[in-house]
Curated annotation (Swiss-Prot):
GO MF term (any one): GTPase activity
Family the entry assigns: Belongs to the TRAFAC class translation factor GTPase superfamily. Classic translation factor GTPase family. IF-2 subfamily.
Biological source species: Latilactobacillus sakei subsp. sakei (strain 23K) (Lactobacillus sakei subsp. sakei)
Entry protein name: Translation initiation factor IF-2
Domain of life of the source: Bacteria
Biased composition (Low complexity): 52-68, 117-153, 240-269
Region of interest called G4, as start-end residue ranges on this chain: 547-550
Chain ranges of the tr-type G domain: 438-607
Binding of GTP, residues: 447-454, 493-497, 547-550
Compositionally biased region (Basic and acidic residues): 173-197, 339-352
Length: 937
């Protein structure tokens, strides 16, 4: 059990914290304030000390022992008063009787003591003037000594001094009231003696149950025959407070009236609930018998009462209805109180954990579940520690540790694992060395364009795969399996064009062995060198296949000499690189090549664990019209099964259908086997890694988090304008843009085309790739192109009929290509066409002014001779005087003799006028030129 604080103990034993601190300090405990903690032994000691003090005080109200010497004899009344208040529920259990002489149950219900007199209604004194007339129902047994204490609230806790002072005040009021009652009784006795000789009215006792002016009648009516009895100062009929003892027609009320001459100072014994109930039953019986006789002789007084002012006494009727309702309620209360109360189920107290494992940012509700406590209790504890929180508010590390210390348990922060970091999971799973078994080698075929890579793979498939196999060789990266000597080999085919550099790099990363295909008639080419660099970067062994040895002019030795310059020395020449001379077209030496591959695989000792979760790499991805996103995967570790939750790059899903390289559906895929899967939520990027998770919920969370991070990373690429790059930004703003939307059949082609377009360099124009995706050209692509004024390039895809109609309507240019060269050339031409034309000045001829003529309305006409070249009608001219350009403008007219001509050649004379210029002099030189457009380089 944990330690307890002083304020908590004070609440439990209902003692002030200050008193507990004083007692604890007297006992030698070093406690500073109410927040100090105590152990179990100290708690027991303090509880015992305060229980010892509280025992006498608690027993005072119930003990009828003699009062102390310091108290008066009235102290017994104080105790009775307190006892009566505390026994209020027992008093409520008594049956309610509608009779003339109700006992003191009402007095107890109002929180007042009976004072040991058991006074009935017939002995009611006349001092109730402070009580409002219409405030009580039709009960004639209400005692008169509760007018002073009706508003006293006995349910509020008071201190002992306050209780003593209130008791003294009540005792003083009681003595004064008793003295008044004595005087009133003496006066009443005197009046009754005078009235004893007078005749009684005929209506004897019929109005016992009817109120008069809102006050219950006590059975004593005036003997005069007047319609209204005389009224005393307090509004009560004179003489109605006590019955006439000499009247033989009235019931024997003296049996129920106790003597009121008992001294007030006599201490009375507390009345138990059983005694009070017996007295109530006795009074009810004694009052009900005479009442039945009286009512039998005379009907009840319903209807209008002439003596009471006429009309129906609705007040009495409503009070009777109220009494019935209240009587029914009391019965129900009695039944409910007597019924066995069902015990509330107790909350099972679960023990606190030894260690609270938390993560930063947990709220109160989370902590409550971990430590098996109510959130309200934790909020209260934090409040006492000076921390205001609500149930859903996140808590920091210090607050959680402080709370754990207060509960007496240790706090340990949970190590957070980034589920979105699948690269770390991939590396961990890939390095697993348990349950290792042999796996097929993964071989990548690389080389320059048209050196025979696809032909070689086609020959391998046709030679070692059953006839009638579905599918064929594609132009994209693809994975296929072939068998030799009952051993599988997985081949990856990569494009050889320069635009597919990323594809070749991906193939080199996931491969075990690289076959470099070099044409014997072509030699080493740029993509051959690039493939060598990829292989060296991946640290994969290279097997050189010298192809096309069947062609005339083939020189394999020249190829071997060239490759020695790149570090590939043949084994025959003392190196460690395997060279195989093959012909992919005829199939020559193909089996030798496969045997070399298996030999190299044996040297590498390739193994994998089939029992773990599958991890691998995306070879290619595309969007199929019927299947949705389709990804070609290469499993590198573990076993991939249908239904596995999987995260592929920034996408996630559950494996629905798996198809192998032959087009057949499979249920599980082992390491080094290629497979096509469906069931992803989006098309992943090629070369993305995939990891299988335990459940779909975790996979979904990881995939969504990765997609979110990728989006944020994409947005952060836009460089904000700063003072450092302001000039560059302004220059870029002056550039023209060619908007392009790329749609291709596979993800790798999309990347290759986008990368090639970005490399086009035309001064003043740049390519802006607005969108690149996999799949057919649809209406949303056309809408985006129309909004951004872009060109749509489709690579091995076609537009849908709706997209084609929409493109024609919105005049969107869609260009479809199957060869990447043509797509690049077309975009380059479009970029050059966006540039403003550049013009270059070309001088066509020179003239010398021989004579000038001034003609009105025309201006000055210059008679010239063409010295060199040709002068045309649309030429621009410069007027040069003393080697200084005086004017530059256009010709207004060009004539030979009187005829307008288009041009005048060297040696001929002509007349010219210059537009808007007349200051021409003899011997001036006129230079003619034209502006010619310069083609964009």
């Amino acid at each position: 059990m944990g330690k307890k604080r002083i304020y908590e103990l004070a609440k439990e034993i209902n003692v002030a914290s200050k008193d507990i601190l004083e007692t604890a300090n007297k006992k030698g405990y070093d406690l500073k304030n109410h927040m100090a903690t105590i152990d179990d032994n100290q708690e027991k000691t303090l509880r015992a000390a305060f229980q010892t003090k509280a025992t006498p005080a608690a027993s005072k109200p119930a003990t009828p022992a003699a009062p102390k010497a310091s108290e008066k004899s009235e102290s017994g009344k104080i105790k009775i008063n307190k006892t009566a208040i505390r026994r209020r529920p027992e008093a409520d259990k008594k049956p309610a009787q509608h009779s003339n002489n109700r006992p003191q149950a009402n007095a107890n219900r109002n929180g007042q003591a009976s004072n040991g007199q058991n006074r009935t209604n017939n002995a009611r004194p006349n001092n109730n003037s402070a009580r409002p007339n219409n405030s009580r129902p039709n009960t004639n047994s209400r005692p008169n000594n509760n007018s002073q204490n009706r508003s006293t609230s006995a349910n509020h806790p008071m201190s002992l001094q306050e209780q003593i002072s209130q008791a003294n005040a009540r005792r003083q009021r009681t003595q004064e009231r008793i003295q008044q009652q004595r005087e009133q009784r003496e006066a009443d006795e005197k009046k009754r003696r005078e009235q004893a000789n007078r005749p009684r009215p005929t209506r004897n006792n019929a109005s016992n149950n009817r109120p008069s002016n809102g006050k219950p009648t006590n059975g004593a009516r005036p003997t005069t025959n007047s319609p209204r009895p005389t009224v005393t100062k307090d509004g009560r009929p004179l003489g109605s407070s006590r019955p006439n003892n000499n009247n033989s027609a009235r019931p024997n009320t003296t049996n129920n009236r106790p003597t009121n001459s008992r001294p007030a100072t006599t201490p009375s014994r507390p009345v138990s609930a059983q005694e009070m109930q017996q007295k109530m039953q006795a009074n009810t019986v004694s009052a009900s018998k005479p009442a039945s006789n009286n009512t039998a002789s005379k009907p009840k007084n319903f209807g209008p009462d002439k003596k009471r002012g006429g009309g129906y006494n609705s007040y009495g009727n409503s009070q009777q209805r109220f009494n019935k309702k209240r009587k029914k309620t009391r019965k129900q209360q009695l039944a409910e109180q007597n019924a066995a109360k069902k015990e509330m189920p107790q909350r099972k107290e679960r023990p606190l954990p030894e260690v609270l494992v938390f993560s930063e940012g947990m709220n109160v509700a989370d902590i409550a579940k971990k430590i098996h406590r109510e959130p309200a209790e934790i909020i209260k504890k934090l409040f006492m520690l000076g921390i205001m929180v609500n149930m859903n508010q996140s808590l920091d590390k210090d607050t959680i540790e402080l709370l754990a210390t207060d509960y007496g348990i240790e706090a340990e922060q949970k190590v957070e694992v980034d589920i979105a970091d699948i690269d770390s999971v991939f590396e961990t799973e890939a390095k697993s060395d348990a349950n290792l078994v042999s796996r097929p080698p993964v071989v990548t075929i690389m080389g320059h364009v048209d050196h025979g890579k696809t032909t070689l793979l086609d020959n391998l498939r046709n030679s070692h795969v059953t006839d009638g196999e579905a599918g064929g060789i594609t132009q994209h990266i693809g994975a296929y399996q072939t068998k030799l000597n009952d051993r599988l080999i997985t081949f990856l085919d990569t494009p050889g064009h320069a635009a597919f550099t990323n594809m070749r790099a991906r193939g080199a990363d996931i491969t075990d062995i690289i076959i470099l295909v070099v044409a014997a008639d072509d030699g080493v080419m740029p993509q051959t060198i690039e493939a060598i660099n990829h292989a060296k970067a991946a640290k994969a062994p290279i097997i050189v296949a010298v192809n096309k040895i069947d062609k005339p002019g083939a020189n394999p030795d020249h190829v071997m000499e060239q490759l020695m310059g790149y570090g590939l020395v043949p084994e025959d020449w003392g190196g460690d690189t395997i060279f195989v001379k093959i012909s992919a077209k005829t199939g020559e030496n193909i089996d030798d090549l496969l045997e070399m591959v298996l030999l190299e695989a044996d040297v590498l000792e390739l193994k994998a664990n089939r029992d773990q979760k599958a991890v691998g790499t995306v070879i290619e991805a595309r969007l199929d019209k019927g299947k949705g996103p389709v990804a070609s995967l290469l499993v590198q570790q573990g076993t991939l099964r249908i239904g596995d939750p999987i995260v592929v790059g920034n996408t996630f899903g559950r494996v629905r259908v798996m198809t192998n390289d032959r087009g057949r559906r499979v249920k599980e895929v082992f390491p080094s086997e290629p497979v096509e899967i469906t069931g992803l939520n989006d098309v992943p990027q090629a070369a993305d890694r995939f990891v299988v998770f335990e459940d779909e919920k975790t996979a979904r969370a990881a995939g969504e988090e990765r997609a979110k991070r990728a989006l944020l990373k994409e947005r952060s690429r836009s460089n904000p304008v700063t003072l450092d790059n302001l000039f560059e930004t302004m220059k870029q703003g002056e550039l023209k843009e060619v908007g392009v939307i790329i749609k291709a059949d596979v993800q790798g082609s999309t990347e290759a085309l986008a990368g090639s377009l970005r490399k086009i360099e035309v001064e003043g124009v740049r390519v802006n790739i607005i969108h690149e995706a996999v799949g057919a050209i649809n209406e949303s692509d056309v809408t985006l192109a129309a909004a951004s004024n872009a060109i749509i390039i489709g690579f091995n895809v076609r537009p849908t009929p709706q997209a084609k109609i929409q493109a024609d309507a919105e005049q969107v240019d869609i260009r479809l290509h199957r060869i990447i060269y043509k797509a690049i050339e077309e975009i380059e031409a479009a970029m050059k066409g966006m540039l403003e034309p550049v013009y270059e000045e070309k001088v066509t001829g020179q003239l010398t002014v021989r004579e000038t003529y001034n003609v009105s309305k025309i201006g000055t006409i210059a008679g010239c001779i063409v010295d060199t070249g040709v002068i045309r009608r649309d030429s621009g001219v410069r007027l040069i005087r003393d080697s200084i350009v005086i004017y530059e403008g256009k010709l207004s007219s060009l004539k030979r003799f009187k005829d307008d001509v288009k041009e005048v050649k060297t040696g001929f004379e002509c007349g010219v006028t210059i537009e808007d210029y007349n200051d021409i002099k003899i011997d001036d030189q006129i230079e003619a030129y034209v502006m010619e457009e310069v083609p964009v380089k």
